[in-house]
C-alpha cells in the first residue's frame, strides 16, 4: 500500500510450489514500487493460478513473507540512500538480532535493500564483548585466547567503549574495532584519531560504529 522495494519472491515461490500453484511475477525482485503515483494507489505484482483451496492455503503465508521482507528491504534502501546523500561511501550493515527462525529471510532482505548482512551467526566471526574481556582480564588477553582457537581466515571483532580500548585492540591484532554507543561527534573524533595514530604502522583494521543510530540522526555520525 505504500512505496517500497519488492522482496521475498524466491521464498513466496516455494510456498506456491508446495501448494501446486502457478505464479507469474509482473514485477522483478528488488524493484522499487510507487503505488502512491497510481490512480488507485495499487500495483499488481503477480498473478497466481490454481485451485481455490490451494490459493487460500498459500495466501496468508506468502503475503506475510512478502510484507515482512519487503519492509526490511525498503528500510534498508532508505537507510543506504540517506547515507549516500550525506556523502558516506562506506558500508551500512544489519545486525545478528533477527526474528527467531527468520534470520535467513531477513538477512536476504537486507541484501536486496542494498545493505551488508554482517555476520550470519556466531560461527561467522569472533566478536569479543565486555563480558569476554572482563572474564579474561584485558582486551589483549581476550584476543590472544581467541587467536589460539580460530583458523587464520576467521576475523576478530572487538567492542570498545573508548579510544584507549580501541588502541589496545588494534595493537593486539583485532581485525574490526566496534566503537559502541559513541555520540556522533565523539565517533568522528575517535575515528580520525585512530586513523592518524595507526597510519603507516603496518596495522590493517576496519572501524565500525554501533548503537544509537537512527534515520533521524544518521547524518550526525557520517
What are these regions (language model features)?
Residues 1-172, 176, 188-193, 220:
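Acidic/glycine-rich phosphate/pyrophosphate-binding loops and surrounding catalytic core
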Residues 179-180, 207-213:
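Glycine-rich beta-strand-to-loop/alpha-helix junction loops that act as flexible
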Residues 196-206:
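Short acidic, glycine/proline-enriched helix-loop-strand junctions
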Residues 211-222:
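C-terminal non-catalytic interaction appendages of large macromolecular assemblies
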Amino acid at each position: 500500500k505504500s512505496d517500497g522495494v519488492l522482496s521475498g519472491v524466491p521464498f513466496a515461490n516455494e510456498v506456491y510450489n508446495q501448494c501446486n500453484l502457478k505464479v507469474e511475477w509482473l514485477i522483478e525482485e528488488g524493484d522499487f514500487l510507487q503505488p502512491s503515483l497510481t490512480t488507485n494507489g495499487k500495483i499488481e505484482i503477480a498473478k497466481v493460478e490454481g485451485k481455490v483451496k490451494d490459493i487460500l492455503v498459500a495466501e496468508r503465508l506468502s503475503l506475510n513473507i512478502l510484507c515482512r521482507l519487503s519492509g526490511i528491504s525498503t528500510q534498508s534502501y532508505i537507510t543506504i540512500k540517506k547515507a549516500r546523500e550525506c556523502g558516506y561511501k562506506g558500508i551500512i550493515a544489519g545486525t545478528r538480532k533477527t526474528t527467531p527462525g527468520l534470520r535467513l529471510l531477513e538477512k536476504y532482505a537486507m541484501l536486496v535493500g542494498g545493505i551488508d548482512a554482517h555476520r550470519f551467526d556466531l560461527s561467522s566471526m569472533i566478536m569479543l564483548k565486555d563480558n569476554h574481556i572482563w572474564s579474561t582480564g584485558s582486551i589483549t588477553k581476550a584476543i590472544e585466547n581467541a587467536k589460539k582457537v580460530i583458523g587464520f581466515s576467521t576475523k576478530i571483532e572487538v567492542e570498545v567503549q573508548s579510544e584507549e580500548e580501541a588502541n589496545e585492540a588494534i595493537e593486539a591484532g583485532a581485525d574490526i574495532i566496534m566503537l559502541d554507543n559513541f555520540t556522533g561527534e565523539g565517533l568522528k573524533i575517535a575515528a580520525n584519531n585512530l586513523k592518524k595514530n595507526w597510519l603507516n604502522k603496518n596495522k590493517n583494521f576496519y572501524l565500525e560504529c554501533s548503537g544509537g543510530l537512527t534515520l533521524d540522526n544518521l547524518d550526525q555520525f557520517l
